[in-house]
Amino acid sequence: MTNIRKTHPLLKILNNSLVDLPAPSSLTSWWNFGSLLGICLAVQILTGLFLAMHYTSDTATAFNSVTHICRDVNYGWILRYLHANGASMFFICLYLHVGRGLYYGSYTYTETWNVGILLLFAVMATAFMGYVLPWGQMSFWGATVITNLLSAIPYIGTDLVQWIWGGFSVDKATLTRFFAFHFLLPFIIAALVMVHLLFLHETGSNNPTGIPSNLDMIPFHPYYTIKDILGLLIMLTALSTLVLFSPDLLGDPDNYMPANPLNTPPHIKPEWYFLFAYAILRSIPNKLGGVLALVLSILVLAIVPMLHTSKQQSMIFRPLSQCLFWLLVADLLALTWIGGQPVEHPYVIIGQAASILYFSIILIFMPLIGTMENHLLKW
């Protein structure tokens, strides 16, 4: 008798993606983050759905509705903090996933990589709009500052900003549309995830060595399902510890004050996961230049496959490239720190130096070192 999972039209697709999928035998824990991101997305959609049942997207009641969720709704507090800190977990996994792709040369699978960049932009847009919804001080001023950046676009900038705002300032219309898009985007992200996986399964997964592993494959289940479950347990432990012991650790205290258009907070800053891009934005004294640098800080990933000069795919056998990669990681951590500091000396100059280094490593040093290592291989 044939197995139903191999014959049923729907189960067959799941079987070929999750059970009988041939996977390289040498995958490390760095390959866990794809499944963790899928679980993060599911958690965010579920908690978000229940939060949306009690939230009101009106400037007069939005702040109070979030308070109501935390105080009066059964387990509303845990839903709210799972959703808020789940976003932080999402970005931790995202950045580690992208870092893994850079280190092991997974960007050579250009279709998968480009869909991944689209996903990154979509998740960032969703997180930004979600941060506006509680309608606290930082929500309001963050929305004002970031949307106002679009006014730097020549000719159409001002009209575009007013069109997004639905008026002459961030107000009721803005909040309502942000809620609508914040609700819609995760489902678009889920569809893009399917496309991401479709392209991945066309080529098969990369592995730490960067050497084709067609001769040494093992079934995804049980080997990698059990490995993914371990990763899931570690992530859930970290998330639940954060939610239950210090749920406001990563938030901004200013967001516990209702939005007041007449009172600007002393330091307007986004959530921690956007600070590196915010630091790059602030390090350029020109408004349009800053906006371009902000977009390019993520979009630069799209040209990484074109700049791959090395004869080896992975960095595992390339010590010079490894040094450069970890310098990039340190630089991003420095940018994250600078993004949270006030705009004053010495933070400004450190931010500018770190921004220049960020683009230099990716656009200049990585390709140069790759070429150099090719020559060293001939010796």
Curated annotation (Swiss-Prot):
Major location (coarse): mitochondrion
Molecular functions (GO terms): metal ion binding; ubiquinol-cytochrome-c reductase activity
UniProt record, GO biological process: mitochondrial electron transport, ubiquinol to cytochrome c
UniProt-annotated binding residues for heme b b566: 97, 196
Keywords associated with the record: Electron transport, Heme, Iron, Membrane, Metal-binding, Mitochondrion, Mitochondrion inner membrane, Respiratory chain, Transmembrane, Transmembrane helix, Transport, Ubiquinone
Requisite cofactors: heme b
Xref: InterPro entries: Cyt_b/b6_C, Cyt_b/b6_C_sf, Cyt_b/b6_N, Cytb/b6-like_sf, Cytochrome_b, Cytochrome_b_C_euk/bac, Cytochrome_b_N_euk/bac, Di-haem_cyt_TM
GO cellular-component term (any): mitochondrial inner membrane
Positions annotated to bind a ubiquinone: 201
Binding site for heme b b562: 83, 182
Membrane topology: Multi-pass membrane protein
Subcellular location per the Swiss-Prot or TrEMBL entry: Mitochondrion inner membrane
Record bears the keyword Ribosomal protein: no
Extra facts: Heme 1 (or BL or b562) is low-potential and absorbs at about 562 nm, and heme 2 (or BH or b566) is high-potential and absorbs at about 566 nm.
The family this protein is said to belong to: Belongs to the cytochrome b family.
Cited function: Component of the ubiquinol-cytochrome c reductase complex (complex III or cytochrome b-c1 complex) that is part of the mitochondrial respiratory chain. The b-c1 complex mediates electron transfer from ubiquinol to cytochrome c. Contributes to the generation of a proton gradient across the mitochondrial membrane that is then used for ATP synthesis.
Description of how the protein assembles with itself and partners: The cytochrome bc1 complex contains 11 subunits: 3 respiratory subunits (MT-CYB, CYC1 and UQCRFS1), 2 core proteins (UQCRC1 and UQCRC2) and 6 low-molecular weight proteins (UQCRH/QCR6, UQCRB/QCR7, UQCRQ/QCR8, UQCR10/QCR9, UQCR11/QCR10 and a cleavage product of UQCRFS1). This cytochrome bc1 complex then forms a dimer.
Official protein name in the record: Cytochrome b
Gene source species: Micronycteris giovanniae
Gene name of the encoded protein: MT-CYB
